[in-house]
Amino acid sequence: MGPFFERVGQDLADQGYAVFRINFNGGDRLFWKLPGATDYRGTFRDWPEFLRRYLKHNSITDILLFGDCRPMHKAALSVCRDEGVHIHVFEEGYIRPDWVTLEPDGVNGHSQLPKDPEYYRRVAAQLPPMPPHVTVPSSFKRRALEGAAYNTADILTRWYFWYWQDYRPWPPLVEGVSWLRRLAKRKKNVARSQEMLRRLKESGRPYVLFPLQLDADVQIRLHSDFRGIADAIELVVESFALNAPKNQLLVIKEHPLDNGLTDWRQVVGRCGKRHGVLERIAYVSYGEIEKLVREAQAVVTINSTTGTLALAENVPVFSLGQSIYNIPDITHQGDLAGFWQAPTPPDMETFNAFRRVLIEYCLVPGGFFSEEGLETLISGVRERLARRKEQQLPDVADILSEVRG
């Protein structure tokens, strides 16, 4: 996240808060120049007890972190709950672009958001009108450079952070080399994708979009039944072959941040050939996801935020994993076999109510990868933390008891 937490820390310090930081590796150290930092160089086994003592010694009342599924973070959250420390978890926005997720206690599959559509209709009806939408720029170049700097600092300081273990399945150096290879092939793959999209448009045939997620994404490994993307591809392609109308196409879109270590085009090709539908699958490495979503007949996803993008366009969505938006009246609630033939579109009143509740209680405007985005985000975080008691999600039982009374 680059300098995000340093900027948040400085803002909190300017307001008079005592701010502390724990670094796990050299990348963490690189992006924190403020006082109050401690390098944790111990083992994973010793981490919970270290943190427990640290919290008590420094009288910590609140903890801020990005994501809640990494092993060190999961252990930290367990300790913080035991010690009564308030938890604030950041994550990429449930709605993108222009938003960042900030929830108490947990996000995604650990979110407190309920699954009853009536809850959202009732809560949204009590909220003021939607605030004006603020569009913020985001730089892929900045994201890439900050990521490279973080990983380089991590590699160069492994001798110091001897016990640090990255949660990702590949060493940073391996990923870095693969990214360079991917960039070298970019021109060729862009041209191939443009040709595929041209042929798709000329065919005039309806298609279902399947946007791939990152293979190392913990949202797949912890919040779905899949071991990785290959398993999901197998299930989707097989179901498509058995149940989709013969005139329907399947468009599979590569994730823009995929590191290229696995050739997903080849994986998809072998799978399509095995199930006899290779000629009905369009694999796209590069392309405007918003346009692909708008023109799709439906979208099938594991738990990608592309799901909320599709729902906002009134495009039917099937969620294969745990997702915050997999709610009756919003996503297709039947099985995948029936989705190909008769996808259920979202009830837009319910989806808009759901979106309104997200923005009020779970999202902060802004972004990580531009100065304007960071300034907007820091301002929103300041306001959200200051009003955290008033901005707690309304109790499910209270809201639904009013309905069922």
Label every model-predicted segment.
Residues 82-87, 248, 314-315:
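A short helix->loop->beta-strand "cap" motif at the edges of active sites that frequently abuts
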Residues 42-58, 256, 261-306, 312:
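Donor nucleotide-activated moiety binding/catalytic core segment of transferases
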Residues 1-25:
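N-terminal subdomain of nucleotide-sugar transferases
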Residues 62-72, 285-331:
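A donor-sugar binding/catalytic signature common to diverse glycosyltransferases
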